[in-house]
Design a protein with these regions (language model features):
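Extracytoplasmic cell-surface/polysaccharide-interacting catalytic and binding patches
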Residues: 1-51, 131, 142-149, 154-158
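Second-shell loop/turn segments in exported
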Residues: 26-36, 89-95, 169, 203
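Stable alpha-helical elements in mature extracytoplasmic
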Residues: 35-42, 100-104, 178, 212-213
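Extended, low-complexity, intrinsically disordered C-terminal regulatory tails
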Residues: 38-71
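Structured segments of extracytoplasmic/periplasmic soluble domains
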Residues: 45-53, 107-114, 185, 219
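Short, glycine/charged-enriched secondary-structure capping and boundary segments
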Residues: 70-73, 197
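Catalytic cores and adjacent binding grooves of peptidoglycan-active enzymes
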Residues: 75, 79-80, 84, 88-162
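Cellulosome-associated attachment modules in secreted, modular CAZymes
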Residues: 161-224
């Protein structure tokens, strides 16, 4: 974690990464902008994994006074530059549309983001760089959703529209998130993206059969 301080007037156009500049994290009532480099990093990873057309930061850094004006404590992760509320956009059949929060939260889980993830509502998601994992639903009094966004969102009636290929280590191992994604594909709940086809053999329709799913599960638990 490295929190850097910028001036909106002087540094607003400074590029932080391929897809983000300083002023996107700005607070309305101050020239000061604080940004955690780890936050920028995970936003870039999310952008790539979801193949976004853009990510809109609806709330980045907040001064303590601005945070309180929103009914918050004035001491949260936004006030230290460690949080961002976002909408993620992509193209579907030539039309730009927002990802549902289910897609974003599940993507962050698959990316291994064991910090703060909050489903605000609908398409809006909160991300922060706290040192401990806390995944929560703001619509349910900020209560923890547990350790699996896929299960939680399914119970809420939200199906992830496109799974994300998880990281595979140098030994070709995958984790339980990858295994679940492949199993979902094998029973027709989701389809694989081009990036995912390297995970297992797929047929011409992009489906994974039960043999592939079983192999991935065995890899996930270290039996293969």
């Amino acid at each position: 974690m490295s929190i850097k301080t910028y001036s909106k007037a002087k540094d607003g156009s400074v590029r932080l990464s391929e897809h983000f500049i300083v002023r996107e994290f700005a607070c309305p009532d101050t020239d000061v902008i604080k940004i955690d480099t780890d936050l920028v990093d995970v936003l870039e990873r999310l952008f790539d994994y979801l193949d976004c057309s853009k990510i809109i930061i609806t709330s980045g850094y907040r001064s303590p006074s601005y945070d309180r004006s929103l009914g918050c404590s004035g001491r949260g992760y936004h006030t230290t530059g460690q949080a961002a509320d976002v909408n993620c956009w992509h193209f579907v059949n030539g039309k730009e549309t927002r990802y549902h929060g289910a897609d974003i939260c599940c993507a962050l889980q698959t990316l291994g983001w064991h910090h703060g993830i909050g489903w605000i509502a609908g398409c809006a998601v909160h991300i922060d760089t706290r040192t401990t994992q806390y995944w929560f639903d703001e619509q349910n009094n900020m209560r923890s959703i547990g350790n699996d966004w896929y299960t939680y969102m399914a119970k809420k009636g939200h199906t992830v529209s496109r799974p994300i290929m998880g990281d595979v280590d140098a030994n070709g191992k995958v984790d339980s998130n990858d295994a679940r994604t492949v199993l979902q594909a094998s029973v027709g709940k989701v389809e694989l993206t081009e990036k995912q086809k390297a995970v297992a053999d797929v047929d011409e329709n992009g489906k994974v059969d039960s043999t592939d799913a079983r192999q991935i599960l065995q890899m996930a638990v270290g039996k293969n």
